């Protein structure tokens, strides 16, 4: 069995199979067709109302002049449709040049590598080939100089073209040419056998526009290739993802023009404090550990102190019970009449025990002094045999407290002030103060009054004369005016308006600035007769 029997049928046919199938179909249609369907135009004289529209309507001829309709035989004169399809090009070997697709929209001088041979390195058959040798120093310098000159020329031309005003180009130097005419003789060339011609470049107008178009339109290059799709196929977005994609609005800590109510959690989220990583110093752990250790030691010390206090209380209790037991024993013996002969011996033994106890305390004190710090030891030794009178601080009141309330006796038995009872109980009389403050002196004499010698250094000795000088007084007064009279006495005196100024102002206000008052204001003259003007 062949291998093709196990393979599935192809979904697409190759080019050869398509051509063979098309050829077979055409043969079958040629065999089955009985009548040829050839379309020809109607004969002359029967073309009324007939309009040629297809290429078959024209037959083998051209247009029909008697039919006044736009006609395009063989599609001549018809506008061709614009297409971006490229024409197939072949190389010298007859192979299709597929690099035309890559060259579309690029300049003709651009090098495009589109073949496999462009990727394969060339094999060097002869290492001594002069084309593969490095150039010498002279060739490098020559090429460098040519390149520099060409670049300078190009740059200078571009800079000069960009400037709004430029100078005329420098003319080339004059050339001298020796000319020998072909016709020799006295009748030709003024009898001269040779001539020297001086050729000079014609001066060019710098403002003349260019005569020829040297720019070549290049088709637009292809766009950038599309970005590759490298994500998974689309799936339905979940509610959680939608909530995660919600972008919170911009929340400002200073402005809220709309007056929205913003929750605190949203404001803190907008503040960005939760995004910052909190770095805790290791000293916090050390402090917590130290506090824990100090607390534990304090608890242990309190517990130990409580145990010592309990033991001391137990010893005191036992000692008290022993003392009570001895007292009870002595009382029983005294009632029984038994005399104790050891009382004297007990008293001497007690004195010896007290002396022994005092010496033990002194030795303990000396040991504590020897173990104490130097500064504390010196302080204790200094205060050891000090007189008690030195401890008293001089100039400090005695802080002895007394339960009795002390009063100042100078405040009692006074006939004036609050203790006198407001003039013997007569509260209608306002005589709380028995005399005026500051002895009844004028306050204006002592307040805002500079001293006499304050401005003496600035104005000199004529300060009083300057003060007494009448300022703002005209040199020549009006007749009838008396400047010597003092201020007015009595109430202000008024007199009637003799010139009618009040009436004039009132009419001007009523008419709103009109040039001539109306007749309606004339009957009101009696209202202004009672007006009075203030006289100063």
Curated annotation (Swiss-Prot):
This is SNW domain-containing protein 1. It holds the Pfam family SKIP_SNW. The modification N-acetylalanine is found at residue 2. Disulfide bonds: none annotated. One of its GO terms (cellular component) is nucleus. Involved in pre-mRNA splicing as component of the spliceosome. As a component of the minor spliceosome, involved in the splicing of U12-type introns in pre-mRNAs. Required in the specific splicing of CDKN1A pre-mRNA; the function probably involves the recruitment of U2AF2 to the mRNA. May recruit PPIL1 to the spliceosome. May be involved in cyclin-D1/CCND1 mRNA stability through the SNARP complex which associates with both the 3'end of the CCND1 gene and its mRNA. Involved in transcriptional regulation. Residues 1-46, 209-234, 311-386, 469-536 are annotated as: Disordered. Belongs to the SNW family.
């Amino acid at each position: 069995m062949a291998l093709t029997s196990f393979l599935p049928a192809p979904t697409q046919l190759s080019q050869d199979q398509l051509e063979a199938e098309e050829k077979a179909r055409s043969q079958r249609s040629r065999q089955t067709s009985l009548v040829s369907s050839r379309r020809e135009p109607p004969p002359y004289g029967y073309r009324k109302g007939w309009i040629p529209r297809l290429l078959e309507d024209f037959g083998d001829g051209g247009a029909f002049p008697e039919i006044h309709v736009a006609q395009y035989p063989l599609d001549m004169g018809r506008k061709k449709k614009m297409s971006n399809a490229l024409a197939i090009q072949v190389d010298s070997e007859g192979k299709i040049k597929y690099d035309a697709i890559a060259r579309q929209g690029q300049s003709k001088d651009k090098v495009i590598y589109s073949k496999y041979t462009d990727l394969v390195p060339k094999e060097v058959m002869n290492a001594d080939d002069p084309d593969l040798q490095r150039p010498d120093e002279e060739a490098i310098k020559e090429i460098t100089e040519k390149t520099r000159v060409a670049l300078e020329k190009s740059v200078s031309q571009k800079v000069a073209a960009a400037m709004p005003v430029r100078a005329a180009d420098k003319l080339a130097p004059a050339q001298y040419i020796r000319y020998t005419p072909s016709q020799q003789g006295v009748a030709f060339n003024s009898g001269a056998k040779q001539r020297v011609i001086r050729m000079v470049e014609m001066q060019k107008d710098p403002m003349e526009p260019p005569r020829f178009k040297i720019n070549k339109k290049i088709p637009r290059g292809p766009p950038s290739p599309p970005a590759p799709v490298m994500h998974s196929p689309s799936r339905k977005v979940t509610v959680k993802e939608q909530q995660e994609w919600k972008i919170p609005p911009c929340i400002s800590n200073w402005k809220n023009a709309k007056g929205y109510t913003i929750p605190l959690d949203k404001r803190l989220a907008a503040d960005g404090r939760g995004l910052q990583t909190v770095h805790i110093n290791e000293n916090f752990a050390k402090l917590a550990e130290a506090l824990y250790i100090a607390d534990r030691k304090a608890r242990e010390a309190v517990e130990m102190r409580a145990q010592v206090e309990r033991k001391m209380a137990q010893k005191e209790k036992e000692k008290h019970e022993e003392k009570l037991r001895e007292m009870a024993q002595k009382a029983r013996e005294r009632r029984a009449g038994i005399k104790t002969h050891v009382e004297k011996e007990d008293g001497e033994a007690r004195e010896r025990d007290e002396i022994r106890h005092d010496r033990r305390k002194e030795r303990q004190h000396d040991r504590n002094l020897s173990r104490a710090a130097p500064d504390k030891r010196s302080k204790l030794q200094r205060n050891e045999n000090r007189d008690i009178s030195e401890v008293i601080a001089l100039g400090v009141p005695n802080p002895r407290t007394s339960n009795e309330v002390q009063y100042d006796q100078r405040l009692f038995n006074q006939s004036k002030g609050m203790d006198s009872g407001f003039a013997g109980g007569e509260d209608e009389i306002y005589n709380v103060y028995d005399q005026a403050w500051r002895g009844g002196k004028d306050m204006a004499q002592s307040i805002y009054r500079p001293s006499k010698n304050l401005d003496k250094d600035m104005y000199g000795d004529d300060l009083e004369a300057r003060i007494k000088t009448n300022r703002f007084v005209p040199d020549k007064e009006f007749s009838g005016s008396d400047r010597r009279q003092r201020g007015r006495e009595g109430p202000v005196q008024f007199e009637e308006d003799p010139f009618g100024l009040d009436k004039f102002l009132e009419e001007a206000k009523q008419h709103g600035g009109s040039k001539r008052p109306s007749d309606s204001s004339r009957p009101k003259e009696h209202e202004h007769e009672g007006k009075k003007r203030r006289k100063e």
